[in-house]
A protein has these predicted regions:
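Short glycine/serine/threonine-rich phosphate/pyrophosphate-binding segments
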Residues: 2, 95, 186-189, 341-344
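Conserved active-site and cofactor/substrate-binding residues in soluble primary-metabolism enzymes
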Residues: 40, 44, 94, 143, ...
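Active-site neighborhood of HAD-like aspartate-dependent phosphohydrolases
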Residues: 170-220, 224
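Long, charge-rich alpha-helical interaction segments
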Residues: 211, 224-230, 242
Length: 396
């Protein structure tokens, strides 16, 4: 009743409320009111508020605001807003101090800070599954945005936590389409390596992959060579591998929330449709675009059908899906781990590098390396209080 009691005093003098803010943190209430009233009654108002505060057992402080100061405050409302999100298994005072030092050095002001995750357990046995996320709402124009982003990424790499910097626009608050890479993103393996081992050509496939990473051959050529080595593999092997796919931590929780919130979701993969469709049926993805292996008489032919889904094609598909769903490209999110994902990560409104190599992380701008894929929810702005683990069941 503190807010009610104090505003009732102001109401008796017909005061206008120009600004109001309140927070209750660990049983400590902080209430700020900016109000306008007739100068002739300001003394009476302050006296009554002091009496009411004493009666309620709270402290009260008054700060007169001149017309000039008020008008300057109004002018500042046009400044850009930014959202800085920090995320990890746990967060330390050192990490928060480092982040806020960078914010201050860029001449930005922190308007508000809120915790998005639930209350952290003290039990060390469950800490490995804990999540901690804090969101800063920041106002102003950075003196050097690129430097700020680089410092955040460097800090993230050395201090074992993830960080996101997003401009607080209309689109940040209404993302509608999320596109995922599959191998080493939705699942903790590379399916083609699993198939190669079962076909007895694991070392040969690894050698081709190494050549591609050295830049000796491009993705399309390496893909053709690796698929050719799978010739003769029984189709039943794919079913066996699909049923044992190691799904990445947080996928089920993330997909439950995204589906309940009405997001469209897609798998855009340089892997194979067989496994993408398996995940689609299990978790309810709306779209799957991947490479289709040719099968004849129950065995792989060593060939593929249709166009190769490479990095360029992933970006094209993201734009196509946004158009089909009538979604602005700024409302899209892309998540991936490899260089092949960079085109879609840089095309999307929000590109997130997931457990990726440094080059991919630096280019994407946003990254998650410390927790599972449900970390995506916090970068969108979801709070744990909106997320119910108890309803994480699928009936597709």
């Amino acid at each position: 009743g503190v807010t009610s009691a104090l505003t009732e005093v102001l109401a008796r003098y017909d005061a206008s409320i120009l600004d109001i803010g309140q927070a209750d943190i660990h049983h400590t209430l902080s209430l700020g009111l900016l109000f306008k009233t007739n100068a002739s009654v300001s003394g009476n108002i302050m006296k009554e508020l002091l009496f009411k505060a004493s009666e309620l057992g709270v402290q009260i402080k008054f700060t007169p605001v001149t017309r000039y100061d008020y008008e300057q405050w109004v002018k500042r409302q046009g400044k850009n807003r930014w959202i800085v999100t920090i995320l990890g298994r746990r967060l330390s005072a050192r990490q928060i101090a480092s982040v806020t030092n960078i914010i201050a050095a860029q001449k930005l002001n922190i308007d508000s800070i809120q915790r998005l995750t639930g209350r952290a357990p003290l039990d060390e046995d469950v800490e490995s599954k804990a999540r901690a996320c804090v969101e800063f709402s920041v106002r102003g124009n950075p003196t050097d945005l690129q430097q700020m982003q680089s410092e955040f990424m460097r800090l993230s790499a050395t201090e074992d936590f993830d960080i996101s910097l997003q401009e607080d626009t209309m689109y940040r608050r209404c993302r509608r389409l999320v596109c995922f890479d599959m191998d080493s993103t939705l699942i903790e393996t590379e399916v083609i390596d699993e198939l190669a081992v079962r076909a007895g050509v694991g070392d040969k496939v690894k050698e081709i992959t190494a050549r591609a990473m050295r830049g000796e051959i491009d993705f399309d050529e390496s893909f053709r060579e690796r698929v050719a080595l799978l010739q003769g593999l029984d189709e039943s092997v794919m079913r066996d591998i699909a049923e044992k796919l190691p799904v990445t931590e947080g996928v089920e929780r993330m997909m439950c929330v995204l589906k309940r919130a009405g997001f469209k979701t897609a798998i855009l993969s340089g892997g194979f449709t067989y496994f993408g469709n398996y995940l689609k049926n299990k978790f309810g993805f709306d779209y799957v675009y991947a490479n289709e292996l040719e099968i004849q008489d129950g065995r792989l032919t060593g060939r593929y059908l249709g166009e190769i889904i490479n990095g360029r094609r992933k970006a094209e598909l993201l734009r196509l899906l946004a158009q089909v769903e009538n979604i602005n490209i700024a409302q899209t999110i892309a998540v991936g781990d490899g260089a092949n994902d960079l085109p879609m990560l840089t095309t999307a409104g929000l590109g997130i590098a997931f457990h990726a190599k440094p080059k991919v992380k630096a280019t994407a701008g946003q990254s998650i390396s410390t927790i599972g894929l449900d970390g995506v929810l916090y970068f969108i702005g979801f709070k744990d209080s909106f997320i119910s683990d108890g309803s994480n069941t699928f009936n597709y």
